Amino acid sequence: MSTQCDRRAAQDARRTLLDSRNQFWKATDIDAPASTAQHLLADLVRQGELRRVRKCLYWRGTKTPLGMAPPSAAALASQLTGQAGIGPAGLSAANALRLSTQIPRQAEYAVPARPPTDTETVRFVNRSARRRRADYELSQTEVAALEVLDGWDRVIETGPQQAMGRLRELISSGGIDAARLAGAGDTEPASARARLRHLLRHTGLAELAEKVPAADPRTEARALAGLAV
């Protein structure tokens, strides 16, 4: 009787898995005995119906002639961190904001906590000191903006004025919440704070700019080089 129940559970679980799209799966998500769930997942990987992302984690996405398409870097980063306030870092941030055409071999993601181990497609960057990103639950676009304001001339391909213009557009269009960005600025590096204050002032948000702690004059002068103050 138990064998029949296990077989029925496996059949039901298989149908559920095959009906899913753009979803991560673990053995614990399957309503079947652990051994049955593990065998089912392994079988579906062999059949090309699932993609093994890492130990104990699988992805059901879109099938292509080359196999199951992998999850996006954003989806994978969110799944592995389970953390608010994550977002693209480095060149990935600049590319996401259309400030660079360069695409790193591994997508870079900043995590405001101890990050998980890297995967084949995603490299995680430790931003545990920048905890306000999580407190204010920044979107990935907002995190990317802070990362660009930090990395700046190391990551942008446009000139500094054009980069600031693009960030102002994102604030004006609602793609970035300026109040959340200002709140999170408290735990950002000094040069990033200087550029953030400049951005907010030149977007007509002087009151928000004053909520961001100022950098020392020398750091501010270096950070704002090439920008009309």
Where are these regions (language model features)?
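Short beta-edge/loop segments at beta->alpha junctions of small alpha/beta modules
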Residues: 2-82
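Generic structural marker for isolated residues within well-ordered, non-membrane alpha-helices
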Residues: 27, 90, 193
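Short coil/turn segments at secondary-structure boundaries
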Residues: 28-29, 106-108, 161-162
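Short, well-structured alpha-helical interface segments that form or flank functional binding sites
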Residues: 36-39, 88, 140
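Short helix-capping and hinge/turn segments at secondary-structure transitions, especially at repeat
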Residues: 46, 98-102, 150, 154
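Short alpha-helix boundary/capping elements
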Residues: 49, 101, 171-175
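Short gly/ser-rich loop at a beta-strand->alpha-helix junction or flexible surface loop bordering the NTP-binding
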Residues: 52-61, 78-127
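Hydrophobic alpha-helical interaction segments
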Residues: 130-229
